[in-house]
Amino acid sequence: MGGLWSMVLPVLSDQKNPNRSPLMSDIAQKVEALAIQAAKTEDCEVVEVIYRREGGVYVVRVAADKLPDDQGQERHISLDECGSISRQISSLLDVHDVIPNAYHLEVSSPGIERPLIKDGDFTRFAGKLVEIRTYQPMDTESGPRKKFRGTLLGLQEAMVVVAEANGEVRIPWEQVAKAHLTFDF
């Protein structure tokens, strides 16, 4: 396996990447389980786990964020919480010996353009500006396209619904290749 390869684990969903290596998938799932355990101690959730080889070095990237408060208000992870989660994951990985090679562990926030991965993300972030890319071009009034940007209306009957300037677009869930929050600056 030469060159750059990566394994992105859509947390709690295995349906989006059927071509991944069984060994990589197994390692990423074990890392995910340990990361979830560590994140819970800081009242956080794991957004995404990426296991990648970069220039001969294995890298584990965990994006974590605070869970909403009791009133449903969004909160954001702090640098101290990222550090705590990183130390816990590192200890858990050492104890469970999940990764057979030397690796670098990085724990961070998902960033301002947080990826939307789980179906619950499409409900939780309804009303927010999103950008979505599809696997295949979708027929629209302006012609076939793979990129959509607008206000997320939610997930309805396995369709991601987005309000664009020209109207509402319904994108089949299984066609969503990548989705993330976005902002107008």
From Swiss-Prot:
Pfam families: DUF150_C, RimP_N
GO annotation, biological process: ribosomal small subunit assembly; translation
Domain of life from the UniProt record: Bacteria
Subcellular location: Cytoplasm
Classification via InterPro entries: Ribosome_maturation_RimP, RimP_C, RimP_C_sf, RimP_N, RimP_N_sf
Alphabetized UniProt keyword annotations: Cytoplasm, Ribosome biogenesis
Gene3D superfamilies, A to Z: Ribosome maturation factor RimP, C-terminal domain (2.30.30.180), RimP-like superfamily, N-terminal (3.30.300.70)
SUPFAM superfamilies with a match to the protein in the record: YhbC-like, C-terminal domain, YhbC-like, N-terminal domain
One cellular component term from this protein's GO annotations in UniProt: cytosol
Predominant cellular place of this UniProt entry's protein: cytoplasm
HAMAP family xref list: RimP
Task performed by this protein: Required for maturation of 30S ribosomal subunits.
Protein family per UniProt: Belongs to the RimP family.
Protein name, per record: Ribosome maturation factor RimP
The organism of origin for this protein: Magnetococcus marinus (strain ATCC BAA-1437 / JCM 17883 / MC-1)
Source organism phylogeny: Bacteria, Pseudomonadati, Pseudomonadota, Alphaproteobacteria, Magnetococcales
